[in-house]
């Protein structure tokens, strides 16, 4: 079964933040971002007979995103999952990007 603590979280925002950057309005051209995201899917190359994942290019955060992340970090250095999901969604980032930045 699902532990009681997990039931109270809003899982729709958790799942939604991975799917697209579009609806949050932080980006000047959402269509460009969607195209770029498709091209950045991790590609697998065969190197010396071994499959090798090609790393995604380093994320460039906008000054708006950085300012918001820094403000939040000054308030609290640790984000619980629902807070991370909410912050990621509000900034048009993935939860992974927010998690890595906080590390």
Swiss-Prot record:
Alphabetical list of CDD domains matching this protein: homeodomain
Entry keyword set: Activator, Developmental protein, Differentiation, DNA-binding, Homeobox, Nucleus, Transcription, Transcription regulation
InterPro entries: Distal-less_Homeobox_TF, HD, Homeodomain-like_sf, HTH_motif
DNA-binding region: 54-103
Pfam families xrefs: Homeodomain
PANTHER family: HOMEOBOX PROTEIN (PTHR24327), HOMEOBOX PROTEIN DLX-2 (PTHR24327:SF23)
Stated name of the protein: Homeobox protein DLX-2
Protein species of origin: Eleutherodactylus coqui
Encoding gene per record: DLX2
């Amino acid at each position: 079964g699902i532990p009681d603590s997990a039931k109270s979280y809003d899982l729709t925002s958790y799942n939604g933040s991975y799917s697209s950057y579009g609806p949050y309005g932080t980006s000047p051209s959402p269509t460009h971002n969607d195209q770029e995201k498709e091209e950045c899917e991790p590609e697998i190359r065969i190197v010396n007979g071994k499959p090798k994942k090609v790393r995604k290019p380093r994320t460039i955060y906008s000054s708006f995103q950085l300012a918001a992340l820094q403000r939040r970090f000054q308030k609290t250095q640790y984000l619980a999952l629902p807070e991370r999901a909410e912050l990621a969604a509000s900034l048009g980032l993935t939860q992974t990007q927010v998690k890595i930045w906080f590390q």
